[in-house]
């Protein structure tokens, strides 16, 4: 489909053949391209700095208007400066925790600092740093950060806290350094709900990669667990797959991991885990999108409904080019409505067997009680 989502996504591929680069260059050089739609989509997908970095790597920036290229360069430079601050902060935090014998396992964006998943250090957009710690060290770690000027992040309050017995959280309340505007989340598990039960903290620690960051010892997820964590986090916690809101930044990281670690990632084991938990449709569609948009080489299982879900996810953004006609104008709305109906159609499963809550909250009486208390 000729949408802004698809065209931006194709630019985010970690590598391109000469033929693929030529095809993409021809599409970007079309005079009817709507650059405002592309920029808006890159921003929505949290992928603008990475978009600029990949365009530079692929030699495609020449096809952009000069003012847009200059604007993207400024955003990329600002994000690079922000990431340098985050790297400095991570080194400081690790030094403090190392001195107290507190082991740290880096998650998500923080892990990319350790292995330089993105050669361009300004490419990855980050809102915070996620650190997994053994549960017995959480309070000491929190106290140490508060001694360094961190406070409870007033913006990091979930509306689902009203649910009694909620197991929605995977970390203690976020800590923000008010002066440096940096937030650190101290995790005791990798994710809440079903993803956290699929990939446990114990499993993560048992196969973690050991290394150093600026002289400080640190761990991060093995490539197999990292890919699994990415796919689960991108599609499950906030019902992203059901709502049709899977972010290109997450798909791009999935593709980057597959490209960086082709020997360490075991597709057969990956899909065995996914099938065991009945997630082959959302995760299979997610991997299919990575393959179609970003040339990811991971094998995907044959899923009968994958093409339908692919269309639902890919076609809900505005057209990439200015086109007249009722169909072109209303196609994104049509697919957004389809995603909304699909999401609402799954509400009974979400309510009675909620992936966001613990196993003890899956019975009908318990769920009705929680709903009643929330309304009251």
How would you name each of these model-derived features?
Residues 1-127, 133-376:
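Conserved NTP-donor binding/palm subdomain of two-metal-ion nucleotidyltransferases/polymerases, i.e.
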């Amino acid at each position: 489909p000729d949408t802004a989502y698809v065209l931006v996504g194709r630019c985010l591929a970690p590598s391109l053949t000469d033929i693929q680069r030529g095809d993409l260059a021809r599409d970007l050089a079309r005079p009817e391209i709507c650059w405002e739609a592309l920029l808006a989509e890159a921003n929505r997908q949290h992928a603008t700095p990475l978009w600029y970095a990949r365009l530079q790597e692929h030699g495609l920036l020449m096809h952009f208007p000069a003012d847009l290229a200059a604007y993207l360069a400024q955003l990329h430079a600002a994000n690079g400066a922000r990431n340098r601050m985050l790297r400095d902060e991570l080194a400081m935090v690790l030094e403090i925790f190392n001195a107290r014998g507190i082991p740290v396992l880096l998650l998500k964006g923080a892990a990319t600092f350790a292995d330089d998943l993105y050669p361009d250090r300004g490419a990855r957009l980050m809102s915070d740093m996620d650190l997994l710690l053994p549960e017995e060290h959480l309070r000491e770690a929190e106290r140490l950060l508060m001694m360094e000027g961190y406070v409870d992040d007033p913006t990091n309050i979930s509306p689902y806290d009203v649910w009694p017995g909620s197991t929605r959280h995977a970390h203690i309340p976020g800590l923000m350094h008010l002066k440096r505007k940096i937030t650190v989340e101290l995790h005791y598990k990798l994710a809440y709900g079903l993803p956290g039960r699929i990939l446990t903290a114990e499993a993560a620690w048992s196969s973690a990669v050991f290394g150093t960051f600026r002289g400080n010892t640190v761990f991060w997820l093995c490539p197999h667990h990292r890919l699994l964590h990415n796919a689960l986090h991108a599609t499950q916690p906030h019902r992203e797959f059901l709502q049709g809101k899977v972010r290109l930044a997450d798909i791009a990281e999935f593709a980057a991991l597959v490209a960086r670690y082709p020997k360490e990632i075991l597709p057969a084991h990956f899909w065995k885990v996914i099938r065991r938990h009945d997630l082959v449709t959302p995760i299979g569609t997610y991997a299919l999108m990575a393959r179609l948009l970003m040339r990811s080489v991971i094998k995907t299982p044959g899923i009968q409904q994958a093409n339908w879900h692919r269309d639902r996810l890919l076609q809900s953004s505005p057209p990439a080019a200015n086109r007249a006609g009722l169909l072109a104008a209303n196609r994104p709305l049509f697919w957004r409505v389809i995603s909304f109906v699909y999401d609402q159609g799954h509400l009974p499963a979400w309510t009675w067997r909620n992936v966001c809550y613990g196993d003890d909250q899956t019975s009908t009486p318990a769920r009705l009680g929680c709903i009643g208390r929330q309304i009251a």
